[in-house]
Amino acid sequence: EMCIRDRLVNSHLDRFALSEANVETYRTPEYMLSSVQDYRPGAPGYQQHIWQATLGNRAIVYTNHPGGKNLKYSPNYWAGNEILPRAAQHKNVVVCIYNIPENQKNDYTHAYFPKNDFDEVLTKGNWTFGRKKDGYVALYSQNATTYQAGERGDICDLLALGRQNIWICETGTKTEWGDFTKFVNAISSAKVSCQELNVNYTSPSIGNVTFGWQSPFTIKGKEQELRWKY
């Protein structure tokens, strides 16, 4: 059944149109994790900010598919997305899948993860970890990542080459985990299996997570609703 919104807005033709956004936010005293669920995946983007982990005023983490280097326009290197991903969140875990078509010149995705704004940052395997006071964040990239300097010279740009990529973000706290090292070791040793545009991740905190470009979002085998029912 087609709703009025679907008849009026073609997300692949009108990147400026406003459409329904199902936002999920999970907040503790140490961090906030927020995302928009299954928002026009594969469609051209504009200024949409799909997800973000916030551990402080400047200690933030998010990913995007850049639209260009010129920061005066949107989408640009840091603001918005040239092609929108498919994202889903349950509590403290976000999965974000990018599927960039061949006709797009920017064949990579990247994360904003500013080293100097965290108290600790380290890399272990495909994971990058950060600590800000008693808040912890972990970011996984299916594709290999390299850190590079941003336009102001600060090391904040975590680049991942490839048109298809799966990113996972998990957050935690000292209260839950104790030492930051325990958080790092538990998540870096957790099972992550990526096949094409599907992922199976065994989160140490919420259990088994599965998601795909065309597959449902499940937690411990139970499908999760990505569109709110009013």
Predicted ranges, named:
Residues 1, 5-230:
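Ser/Thr/Asn(+Pro)-rich, low-complexity disordered segments
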